């Protein structure tokens, strides 16, 4: 399967009916600013957090720790410390910190959704 290049994937903010602080509104502003400029240069895709949780963990009730565990199980099964390893024996996720885990989760979600979409497209009508 060949992918069309996607240069940027951005996690979108969604409303769940709860009160939010100024940080959320600032994040929305920055998403808009980045999107406006990046769309001039690249294909931009958007992912919601609930889609990350569902795609990676199979549940919308997942949290950051659950997502990290699922990613470690998928990409670094059996490696200690969520696949980070140690300085002398670095693992797949060596050097990952909070925001890097989140960015990786966004990228993997986009990849998996794109794979799913393309497979559905490819086999549309097969077996009907």
Describe each model-derived feature in a short phrase.
Residues 1-128:
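Phosphate- and other anionic-substrate recognition elements at nucleic-acid/protein interfaces
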